[in-house]
């Protein structure tokens, strides 16, 4: 009888000990979400020791990776850079590479080396297997995006909106992405053309069309103003990481 009572008491102690263990584990699991609920600004400051950049009093962290927000920023830089290089060519008669060499005092060979190094760095960063190319939120939305010409070969130039991924006229972020991509391609090909021919973007355009700068001046002014306005216009719409903020 005494053995039975001691066995029951031991079993009760084991049950209470397990309950205490469960309580401790539950308490520990409740603390973890607080650690995971840090904002992006706090993570940026913890990782770098620096406050996140701020625009108009609103802080935002810098995220590496091929996200739409980063591509929008790079596209804006390309539009501003392309416009500034065209204005510089009108004033000096020199292309972007020659202007860069004039400002820095570097010769053509050194400038070409810097440009090639920059291109190589971006290519390596883009294809490096260990680099994080997409944030999880961007990956989750890939399946929800409408198919483009790379996903569906039936989409051709006969359907320009689907082919270029735009929704019509207007300063939306989707349209600005397209304009930014066009500016990046145009700027890149103008630099390649200048490295091959020694002529800037405007001189290359004159060679291709046979028109002088005087004939194309009005269209050029409209093009430059459009790029500058598109670069500084905030537009409408949101991206994934902005909606989750």
Curated annotation (Swiss-Prot):
Residues 1-25 form a transit peptide. The keyword Transit peptide applies. The keyword Transmembrane helix applies. Induction: Induced transiently by high light stress (at protein level). It comes from the Eukaryota. The chain crosses the membrane at residues 72-92, 108-128, 185-205, 217-237. It is found in: Plastid, Chloroplast thylakoid membrane. GO terms for biological process: nonphotochemical quenching; photosynthesis. One of its GO terms (cellular component) is chloroplast thylakoid membrane. It is a multi-pass membrane protein. Keywords: Chloroplast, Membrane, Photosynthesis, Photosystem II, Plastid, Thylakoid, Transit peptide, Transmembrane, Transmembrane helix. Belongs to the ELIP/psbS family. Required for non-photochemical quenching (NPQ), a mechanism that converts and dissipates the harmful excess absorbed light energy into heat and protect the photosynthetic apparatus from photo-oxidative damage. Seems involved in the activation of NPQ, possibly by promoting conformational changes required for activation of LHCSR3-dependent quenching in the antenna of photosystem II (PSII). This is Photosystem II protein PSBS1. It comes from Chlamydomonas reinhardtii.
């Amino acid at each position: 009888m005494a053995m039975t009572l001691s066995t029951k008491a031991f079993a009760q102690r084991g049950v209470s000990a397990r309950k205490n263990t469960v309580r401790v584990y539950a308490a520990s699991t409740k603390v973890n979400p607080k650690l995971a609920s840090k904002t992006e600004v706090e993570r940026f400051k913890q990782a770098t020791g620096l406050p996140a950049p701020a625009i108009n009093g609103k802080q935002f962290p810098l995220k590496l990776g091929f996200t739409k927000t980063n591509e929008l920023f790079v596209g804006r830089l390309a539009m501003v850079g392309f416009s500034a290089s065209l204005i510089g060519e009108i004033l000096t008669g020199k292309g972007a590479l020659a202007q860069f060499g004039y400002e820095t005092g570097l010769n053509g060979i050194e400038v070409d080396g810097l440009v090639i190094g920059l291109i190589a760095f971006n290519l390596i960063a883009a294809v490096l297997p260990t680099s994080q190319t997409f944030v999880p939120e961007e990956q989750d939305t890939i399946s929800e995006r409408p198919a483009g010409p790379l996903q569906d070969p039936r989409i051709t130039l006969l359907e320009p909106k689907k082919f270029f991924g735009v929704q019509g006229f207007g300063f939306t972020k989707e349209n600005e992405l397209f304009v930014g991509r066009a500016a990046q391609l145009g700027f890149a090909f103008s630099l390649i053309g200048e490295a091959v021919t020694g002529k800037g973007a405007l001189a290359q355009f004159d060679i291709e069309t046979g028109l002088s700068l005087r004939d194309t001046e009005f269209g050029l002014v409209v093009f430059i103003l459009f790029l500058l306005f598109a670069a500084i216009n905030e537009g409408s719409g949101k991206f994934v990481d902005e909606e989750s903020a």
